């Protein structure tokens, strides 16, 4: 950003079936890193390698096409519309082509319910408004949506912030469920070390745009 270097020498590895926690206080560089990995910002130096191939992101679509899905704090959900409509949100299944296609509502309902069940949330009514769901359920909806639409790397931006303790535990259980699928790498952005310790396999600590520590879960035991 001009003469200011937001991230300097930051390096991290992520692997399918693992949670890599990225920790740091406000201003540490977590937001800049997540926006770079998700294509909002373009890196001015360094490299991003996905499945052995170097990639360059000029837009969020580039990152999405490479299999990187990001769930931000605001979740990009419409509280007044249904679970199913939020799950597909612009990528609805339709009969026919053009602006007058009919929505395949039953198929979309079935997919939304099944995908959320895979990671631990059972929805009895996919037509319920998202605003009636708990914060933890809304997080699960956003995560399930990212996975269904091809995320191989799932970036979670402060997923437990602004939630009550019970809802925080719901979200942590969801993260463990995704981890157990075995084929998705998870980057958990958080400032809550307790939550990170409950789910993460690897840790990277940031301060003022630089890595000040890293290690495996077993390194932090005790």
Label every PLM stretch briefly.
Residues 1-222:
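Glycine-rich phosphate-binding loops of nucleotide-dependent enzymes
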């Amino acid at each position: 950003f001009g003469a200011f270097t937001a991230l300097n020498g930051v390096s991290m590895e992520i692997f399918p079936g693992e949670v890599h926690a990225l920790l740091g206080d406000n201003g540490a560089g977590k937001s800049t890193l997540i926006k770079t990995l998700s294509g909002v910002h373009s890196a001015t130096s360094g490299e991003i390698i996905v499945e052995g191939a170097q990639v360059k992101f000029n837009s969020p679509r580039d990152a999405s096409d490479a299999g990187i899905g990001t769930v931000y704090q605001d979740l990009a959900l419409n509280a007044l519309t249904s679970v199913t409509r939020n799950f597909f949100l612009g990528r609805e299944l339709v009969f026919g082509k053009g602006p007058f296609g009919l929505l395949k509502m039953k198929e979309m309902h079935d997919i939304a319910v099944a995908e959320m069940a895979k990671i631990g949330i059972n929805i009895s009514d996919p037509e319920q408004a998202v605003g009636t769901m708990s914060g933890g359920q809304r997080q699960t909806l956003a995560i399930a949506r990212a996975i269904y639409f091809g995320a191989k790397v799932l970036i979670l931006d402060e997923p437990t912030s602004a939630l009550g303790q019970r809802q925080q535990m719901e979200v942590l259980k969801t993260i463990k469920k995704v981890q157990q699928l075995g084929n998705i790498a998870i980057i958990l952005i958080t400032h809550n070390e307790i939550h990170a310790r409950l789910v993460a396999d690897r840790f990277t600590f940031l301060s003022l745009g630089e890595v000040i520590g890293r290690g495996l879960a077993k390194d932090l035991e005790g």
